[in-house]
Regions:
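Carboxylate-rich, polar loop motifs that coordinate divalent cations or form catalytic acidic clusters
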Residues: 1-240
Length: 240
């Protein structure tokens, strides 16, 4: 009886190991250093066709399910890619030298606005009325034809403070993570803006709003969160 139990146990272990073995066999690895002159992956995005786009410190790569191919275009080649974002059939490429819109259906790449040329683009977001672009020091408001509406400068006099991240919610609020806290921008009906500091402290690395309408604030080794509808400096709760 003991012998039978041991056999059953061995068979069970073998059966349970198959899914993990299959998973390991299906994991693909790409060594950028071995074949390309790229070092750091900075972002990843999936488009409406299911293809994966990788932003690197020296350009953009496309993974079509079989292989990696560099996106070769004079406007974005050799650019440091801060982030990738997509809307409909357009991939938005935020670089240290401007924001570019790449239509992957027509294979066409354009600078979104001359105002953004040579600027360090940190984030791109949109709502039903506006397109909002954050550089490391400023926030630009555009309509959907990339006509300029308004610009707000954050920490104009501070040389050691920069915008690190941005999220928008509703049609009239944008939240900025900076190297020293959290700033909210209220967008008026006429497109004018005003800003207030909600929280001062350590550098904010990333902001995220979840499906329950809670704001997550990543500060390196610590995460803060708050209900976005009642956000103020008192109601932010922290956990590790």
């Amino acid at each position: 009886m003991k012998h039978i139990s041991k056999v059953i146990l061995v068979l069970l272990c073998i059966l349970l190991s198959y899914p993990f073995y299959g998973m390991a066999q299906n994991i693909k690895s790409f060594d950028f250093k071995g074949n390309f002159f790229y070092n750091t992956i900075t972002s990843i995005e999936q488009d409406t066709l299911g293809f994966m786009w990788l932003g690197l410190d020296n350009g953009v790569f496309l993974f079509d399910g079989y292989s990696l191919q560099p996106l070769i275009h004079s406007m974005i080649s050799d650019r440091y890619v801060n982030f990738l974002s997509h809307r409909k059939t357009t991939l938005y490429i935020g670089t240290n030298e401007g924001l570019y819109a790449y239509n992957y259906i027509n294979n066409q790449c354009d600078l979104c606005s001359p105002l953004l040329k040579s600027r360090n683009i940190i984030a791109y977001q949109c709502n039903s009325d506006y397109q909002v672009v954050a550089t490391d020091r400023e926030v630009f408001l555009f309509d959907y034809n990339w006509n300029f509406i308004h610009k707000i400068t954050i920490y104009k006099e501070s040389l050691n403070n920069h915008i690190t991240s941005m999220v928008i919610y509703g049609n009239q609020e944008a939240l900025l993570g900076t190297e020293s806290g959290l700033v909210i921008i209220h967008i008026e009906n006429d497109g004018k803006t005003k800003s207030n500091t909600l929280y001062s402290g350590d550098k904010i690395v990333q902001l995220f709003i979840d499906s329950r309408n809670k704001l997550w604030i990543c500060r390196g080794e610590e995460i803060l969160y708050s209900n976005i509808d009642t956000l103020d400096s008192v109601e932010i709760s922290g956990f590790k």
